[in-house]
From Swiss-Prot:
<feature type="binding site" description="in other chain">
    <location>
        <begin position="13"/>
        <end position="16"/>
    </location>
    <ligand>
        <name>IMP</name>
    </ligand>
</feature>
<dbReference type="InterPro" id="IPR033128">
    <property type="entry name" value="Adenylosuccin_syn_Lys_AS"/>
</dbReference>
<dbReference type="GO" id="GO:0005737">
    <property type="term" value="C:cytoplasm"/>
</dbReference>
<keyword id="KW-0342">GTP-binding</keyword>
<dbReference type="GO" id="GO:0000287">
    <property type="term" value="F:magnesium ion binding"/>
</dbReference>
<feature type="binding site" description="in other chain">
    <location>
        <begin position="38"/>
        <end position="41"/>
    </location>
    <ligand>
        <name>IMP</name>
    </ligand>
</feature>
<feature type="binding site">
    <location>
        <position position="306"/>
    </location>
    <ligand>
        <name>GTP</name>
    </ligand>
</feature>
<feature type="binding site">
    <location>
        <begin position="332"/>
        <end position="334"/>
    </location>
    <ligand>
        <name>GTP</name>
    </ligand>
</feature>
<dbReference type="GO" id="GO:0044208">
    <property type="term" value="P:'de novo' AMP biosynthetic process"/>
</dbReference>
<keyword id="KW-0963">Cytoplasm</keyword>
<dbReference type="InterPro" id="IPR042109">
    <property type="entry name" value="Adenylosuccinate_synth_dom1"/>
</dbReference>
<feature type="binding site">
    <location>
        <begin position="12"/>
        <end position="18"/>
    </location>
    <ligand>
        <name>GTP</name>
    </ligand>
</feature>
<feature type="binding site">
    <location>
        <position position="144"/>
    </location>
    <ligand>
        <name>IMP</name>
    </ligand>
</feature>
<comment type="function">
    <text>Plays an important role in the de novo pathway of purine nucleotide biosynthesis. Catalyzes the first committed step in the biosynthesis of AMP from IMP.</text>
</comment>
<dbReference type="GO" id="GO:0005525">
    <property type="term" value="F:GTP binding"/>
</dbReference>
<comment type="subunit">
    <text>Homodimer.</text>
</comment>
<feature type="binding site" description="in other chain">
    <location>
        <position position="240"/>
    </location>
    <ligand>
        <name>IMP</name>
    </ligand>
</feature>
Length: 428
């Protein structure tokens, strides 16, 4: 195994940060390839808890190279706030440990402003954006009007690009939405300061990452969000603005598909999502409330309560197919301890037909009735399991169902938030 992917197999919040931290122990390089500081990863090391948004989870190891790829949209203000936060917890961050793609696009103040304005303008049709400027930054990237990191650190290029872009953005903000114009000098001076601080970290990451792979180093690609939030294969428009699936690695980190050897899908033992959109297995009762409280299902980035539901194997099967997953890592199976009976969705009934895939149409997905199979539960002793044989028999049956239905093995099981509560039960 030389280069492998860790990505979310549901609607995000599956425990990718913890799994990346666990797998990073044997990696040499950890690469973020998409998204921005809208992501939220929580990693527990000993008695310390770290909340990461932009910087790869490998930063918690002293001997790893961490990479922010060109597919990421970078908010310099958020980056340096996160660096200061980590350094306050004793994590050293230097250009030897963190590098940033010169091709990554930069989130500007007008992106955050427009994100909020447009979301409010949607009224009850809002899509649940985090308001961090992610979508507008990706929009500028596709419209070829964005500012990249390599532009930002070249003063003359940045000056010219900012003048041209801000003139257009201010017209949109003031004339269309009735907002206040942004001040050029204020933005220019603020971002010049960021440019100087960024400069030592900026590299052509594609060259470096490919050389690491060629030299036989272990490279881990860390995804953000989840498969059902992918811009193409997610529950559009209630999605993020980037490609969250395995194919996004090639574009977002500048590596070829033949370089990737394995892809691990991270899946909770139940299902959650934040914000609006269809959710076939959602629990709108006391069981859903119980799972939310026991699983601490509140967003790291937004603090919003997550919607909770039964495990949806249709979603996992779809994720395995789209990303060519070689295995699953199942997290938070301990959260379900104490329930006498569990349900697992094994298909949807749509217009009288049974299907085992996620339909593209939101209207169709909203009409899907979940078909359930019931399983007997297990008790809280599962949190003490440290190997596969320690797991309760009913939990093993539950995991076996995931494998059989998705035709994808379960390689890792997590029974709690700490590093030592993770067990590898087969090769990934």
């Amino acid at each position: 195994m030389s280069a492998f992917i860790v990505l979310g197999a549901q609607w995000g919040d599956e425990g990718k940060g913890k799994m990346t931290d666990y797998l990073a122990e044997n990696a040499d390089v950890v690469v973020r390839f998409q998204g921005g500081n809208n992501a939220g990863h929580t990693v527990v090391v000993g008695e310390k808890e770290y909340k990461l948004h932009l910087i790869p989870s490998g930063i918690l190891y002293n001997d790893k190279l961490n990479v922010i790829g060109n597919g990421v949209v970078l908010d310099p203000k958020a980056l340096f706030e996160e660096i200061n936060y980590l350094e306050s917890l004793g994590v050293e961050i230097t250009p030897d440990r963190l590098i940033i793609s010169d091709r990554a696009h930069v989130i500007m103040p007008y992106h955050r402003i427009l994100d909020g304005i447009k979301e409010r303008a949607r009224g009850n049709k809002d899509i649940g954006t985090t308001g961090k400027g992610i979508g507008p930054s990706y929009t500028d990237k596709m419209e070829r009007s964005g500012i990249r990191v390599c532009d930002l650190i070249h003063k003359e290029v940045f000056e010219e690009n900012l003048k041209e872009t801000l003139e257009v953005k201010n017209k949109i903000i003031t004339e269309i939405f009735g907002g206040e114009a942004l001040d050029y000098n204020e933005i220019y001076n603020e971002y010049l300061g960021y440019a100087e601080k960024l400069r030592p970290f900026v590299k052509d990451i594609s060259v470096i990452v490919n050389k690491k792979i060629k030299d036989g180093k272990e490279v881990l690609f860390e995804g953000a969000q989840g498969t059902l939030l992918d811009i193409d294969y997610g529950t559009y428009p209630y999605v993020t603005s980037s490609s969250t699936i395995a194919g996004g690695v090639c574009i977002g980190a500048g590596v070829g598909p033949t370089a990737i050897t394995n892809a691990v899908g991270i899946a909770k033992a139940y299902t959650t999502r934040v914000g609006k959109g269809p959710f076939p297995t959602e629990l709108l009762d006391s069981t859903g409330d119980w799972v939310r409280e026991k699983g601490h299902e509140f967003g790291v980035t937004t603090g919003r309560a997550r919607r909770c539901g039964w495990l949806d194997l249709v979603i996992l099967k779809t994720s395995a197919r789209i990303s060519g997953l070689t295995s699953f890592a199942v997290t938070k199976i301990d959260t379900l301890a104490g329930l006498d009976t569990l349900k697992v969705c094994t298909g949807y009934r749509l217009n009288g037909e049974i299907i085992d895939y996620v339909p593209a149409s939101l209207e169709d997905l909203a009409k899907c009735e979940p078909i359930y199979e019931e399983f007997e539960g297990w008790d809280d002793s599962i949190a003490n399991a440290r190997c596969y044989e320690d797991l309760p028999e009913n939990a093993i049956k539950y995991l076996k169902k995931i494998e059989d239905f998705t035709e994808t093995k379960v390689s890792i099981v997590s029974v709690g938030p700490k590093r030592d509560q993770t067990m590898m039960i087969s090769e990934i």
